[in-house]
């Protein structure tokens, strides 16, 4: 699973996801992509599950680019522990995704397989997404 090798701080504030994506909103590498339509925190496990669904359906043909990275730690207190006595330990890693952000890009497969594969990947994510394709040049 994806997580940073080294971070400046162990724990992070919850924060809010405001606005729309300005960077990472267009296809940069592949011919087809999956674009987020709502703000959401996507965990490293969800990204990995979507990536596996994507590569399995493509039968390892073509190329996959993951355009988001889970760099925000989410802390959690153990079960049945009273409130107080500090913030919990880092439990998982999430990526803050804004609407309009391209999550996955693929290339080297035809339109039908790309659409099916990205639909399967979208089912693994907790977010509304849209299939995008590069205009034929």
UniProtKB/Swiss-Prot annotation:
Assembly description: Part of the 50S ribosomal subunit.
Function: Binds 23S rRNA and is also seen to make contacts with the A and possibly P site tRNAs.
Superkingdom: Bacteria
Assigned keywords, A-Z: Ribonucleoprotein, Ribosomal protein, RNA-binding, rRNA-binding, tRNA-binding
GO molecular function list: rRNA binding; structural constituent of ribosome; tRNA binding
Family, as annotated: Belongs to the universal ribosomal protein uL16 family.
InterPro entries cross-referenced by the UniProt entry: Ribosomal_uL16, Ribosomal_uL16_bact-type, Ribosomal_uL16_CS, Ribosomal_uL16_dom, Ribosomal_uL16_sf
Pfam hit, one: Ribosomal_L16
The protein, known as: Large ribosomal subunit protein uL16
Gene: rplP
